[in-house]
């Protein structure tokens, strides 16, 4: 609870033969109230994963019920199944769920969020200074670039890091077929968060024009 920096890595023992996608590796309320830092879990988290997360970046291979409840910031990537009531009360941050079977819409609480397809990488944006290009070991900023853009790039970076830190077989498989895998992710975007970001962007544009 309350992670405020650093990195947490929890992975399967080398001799383990169990399937990480069916194995609960961390318990309930992990990353509750986290404000910064990063965490990678090679397995499934229990209930209320990343509740009230306000800035941590994390990858996990499945969650129990009520994941990302009341989340206000940060980035969460789920490479497996989620429980029910995902994103209830989520007002900020972004999440991505791998959803090859198309079941996530029935497990997500969509009262405050929109579910979107992940936008493909855009080569024309390669030189954009806001693009998340940090493929190094550390996360340079909790937002990882403009939350309204760069979904494919952001996702790939985090799946790469998850594989680097945990040796995850699921991450390796996704990266090996990334062109198809990225299309099976769903982005969870809070409605009020998007509106606030668009308003801030509009205000910055007006300020730049006025300065000219």
For each of these PLM feature ranges, what is it?
Residues 1-212:
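Long, distal/terminal scaffolding or interaction modules
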């Amino acid at each position: 609870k309350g992670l405020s920096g650093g990195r947490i890595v929890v992975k399967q023992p080398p001799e383990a033969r169990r399937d990480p996608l069916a194995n609960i590796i961390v318990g309930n309320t992990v990353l509750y109230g986290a404000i910064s830092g990063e965490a990678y879990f090679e397995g499934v988290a229990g209930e209320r994963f990343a509740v009230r997360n306000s800035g941590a970046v994390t990858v996990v291979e499945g969650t129990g019920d009520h994941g990302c409840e009341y989340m206000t910031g940060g980035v969460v990537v789920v490479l497996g199944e989620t429980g029910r009531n995902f994103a209830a009360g989520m007002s900020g941050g972004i999440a991505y769920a791998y959803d090859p079977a198309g079941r996530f819409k029935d497990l997500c609480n969509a009262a405050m969020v929109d579910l979107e397809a992940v936008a493909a990488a855009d080569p024309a944006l390669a030189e954009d200074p806001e693009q998340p290009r940090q493929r190094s070991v550390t996360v340079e900023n909790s937002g990882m670039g403009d939350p309204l853009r760069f979904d494919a790039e952001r996702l790939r970076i985090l799946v790469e890091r998850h594989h680097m830190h945990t040796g995850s077989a699921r991450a390796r498989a996704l990266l090996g077929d990334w062109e198809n895998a990225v299309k099976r992710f769903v982005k969870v975007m809070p409605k009020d968060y998007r509106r606030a970001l668009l308003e801030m962007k509009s205000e910055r544009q007006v300020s730049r024009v006025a300065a000219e």
